[in-house]
A protein has these predicted regions:
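Conserved small/polar residues in nucleotide/adenosyl-binding loops
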Residues: 1-5
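Glycine-rich, charge-decorated loop segments at or immediately adjacent to ligand/cofactor-binding or catalytic sites
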Residues: 6-17
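Glycine/tryptophan-enriched, flexible segments
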Residues: 18-174, 282-283, 287-352
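Active-site-proximal binding-pocket segments
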Residues: 109-301
């Protein structure tokens, strides 16, 4: 693991009065970019590892579950330092050009997928930052946008440093009285990618099958959980922690508080991502959704993100039987949005 896995330490980026930033833009622009530049990456150490003494093998202790989940995830990753370097070079050679716009489209290769390597210390964030900054052939706006995403990582770590209970407590304490629902059936449907809302289900299946989820999809699925289903963000944080290969206390907790509206610089609670229009905008040809929801592959694009609106003849032609081959929606998107906004209004008015 990297001893220091941040570009700036939290205590190095504070406001003039010595208090921590609570909003990302001034944190990054006035704090990070105005501070001393991140140090250059250090060369890899030359360490001779001693041969360990013989001992009982881990397998003999029967500590691991019988089902090897890692076996399913492994084909999607080149694990280790060499894999991290290869991933970085592939991103610099192809993915980062067009990053500003392409990073929101899950079927395109415009995200770095370096977060697992950063989390496990297989590459340093300094190496990634300087590799992007020093690559003279890259569009400046794409590099700046990518580096600002590394800045969000710094912001999350700063929030955790100054708020060590970030994983457990709302940063905005008014949300302590929010009217969350408890429904194990809805939670299981969300976890399994069986909500009947294809763009959400595709993302949840990507998570289960690969240990990863595109950032746009993390926002869409998070919004669906805490707003349409109105289940506590703790449930989402715990599931992502269990399933993501890049699971990180700071990023995971801060991101869930952001989407729930109870965190620092949070998305307002009344901003509810519509998974139908999100799919139509960011997965126009349906490549991502069809990859992870193959039972819907033959649906026309017009109905792919809302199959419950398709005429029976269209469903029959695509081999889709709602409630059998693919679930009906677990909630009505319009009504559940209105219910969420009503719950927030009660909180704001102190009527909860």
């Amino acid at each position: 693991m990297c001893i220091r896995d941040r570009l700036w330490e939290p205590w190095e980026v504070q406001k003039g009065d010595g208090t921590p930033y609570k909003v990302f833009t001034p944190f990054y622009r006035r704090g990070c970019l105005a501070a001393a530049p991140p140090r250059a990456p250090l060369p890899a150490p030359q360490i001779g590892l001693a041969t360990p003494p013989s001992a009982t093998s881990v397998d003999d202790l029967n500590l691991l579950p019988a089902e090897d989940w890692g076996e399913m995830l492994a084909p999607h990753w080149q694990i280790g330092e060499a894999g991290a370097e290869a991933r970085l070079q592939a991103f610099l050679d192809g993915g980062i050009a067009g990053y500003k716009e392409g990073r929101n489209i899950p079927a395109k290769p415009h995200v770095s997928r370096l977060s697992p390597h950063l989390h496990w210390g297989e590459i340093s964030v300094n190496r990634v930052w300087h590799a992007a900054r020093d690559h003279n052939d890259l569009p400046a706006e794409d590099v700046d946008n990518f580096c600002s995403e590394l800045g969000w990582r710094e912001f999350s770590h700063s929030l955790l440093y100054f708020n060590p209970e970030l994983k457990r407590r709302n940063l905005q304490t008014k949300f302590d009285g929010f009217d969350w629902r408890e429904d194990d059936g809805l939670l299981r449907a969300w976890q399994r990618g069986m909500t009947g809302v294809p763009f959400v289900d595709a993302a949840m299946r990507e998570l289960w099958q690969t240990g990863y989820m595109h950032n746009r999809m993390r926002m869409v699925t998070g919004s669906f959980l805490v707003k349409n289903l109105r289940l506590h963000w703790h449930h989402g944080e715990a599931w992502f922690w269990d399933c993501l290969v890049d699971a990180d206390h700071a990023n995971n907790s801060a991101s869930w508080q952001w989407i729930a509206g109870c965190g620092a610089d949070a998305a307002p609670y009344f901003r509810v991502f519509n998974p139908v229009t999100q799919g139509e905008k960011f997965d126009k040809d349906g490549a991502y959704t069809r990859r992870f929801c193959p039972e819907l592959a033959d649906l026309p694009d017009k109905y792919l993100f809302a199959p419950w609106t398709a005429p029976k003849a269209v469903l029959d032609g695509a081999g889709v039987r709602l409630g059998e081959t693919y679930p009906r929606p677990v909630v009505d998107l319009k009504q559940s949005r209105e219910d969420a906004l009503a719950a927030f209004a009660r909180l704001r008015e102190g009527a909860v």
